[in-house]
Amino acid sequence: MPEEIATLAGGCFWCTEAAFKLLRGVLEVVPGYAGGHVPHPTYEEVCTGTTGHREAVQVRFDPGVLPYADLLRYFFAVHDPTSEDRQGPDVGPQYSPAIFYHSEEQKRVAEAVMRELAPLYPKPIATKLLPFTTFYPAEAYHRDYFARHPEAPYCRFVIAPKLEKARKAFKSLLRP
């Protein structure tokens, strides 16, 4: 089976990058910016909330090891899909959750997973399902942020608890 790309926005990309690196079948995770109208945005520009971009990750994965539906179920567990412009302490349109589908098949699978999971939440799912257009990798200092700064307060109090929750809930999907 050929590799696939998933582009997902689930709040702070430091969190989502660290979360997806835990999974079997994930070959690469790149933090960056997706969905906006400003070409080659900087972090500072995206933080203004005026570029239309969301903090996102591009996940290159082997669907023979990690089916896209399982990747999405995991994604829904590591972000709050009922919150439109907020993920934990992070507020603004750049933290708005979205699935950027790369094919009609990805769109179909995402719609099915969203229907499957919707009854589990007390509020409607706010995560948007959007066609992929462009992705701009984030600046180098954002890459592997959690791995390089595990003692930073944001990493200890926001990312680490999220990863621990994911490890407990998705043991079968994790790398050995």
Swiss-Prot record:
EC number(s) recorded for this UniProt protein: 1.8.4.11
Molecular function terms from GO: L-methionine:thioredoxin-disulfide S-oxidoreductase activity; peptide-methionine (S)-S-oxide reductase activity
SUPFAM superfamilies: Peptide methionine sulfoxide reductase
Keywords: Oxidoreductase, Plasmid
Catalytic residues (UniProt): 12
Classification via Pfam families: PMSR
Family: Belongs to the MsrA Met sulfoxide reductase family.
The protein's role, per its UniProt record: Has an important function as a repair enzyme for proteins that have been inactivated by oxidation. Catalyzes the reversible oxidation-reduction of methionine sulfoxide in proteins to methionine.
Protein name: Peptide methionine sulfoxide reductase MsrA
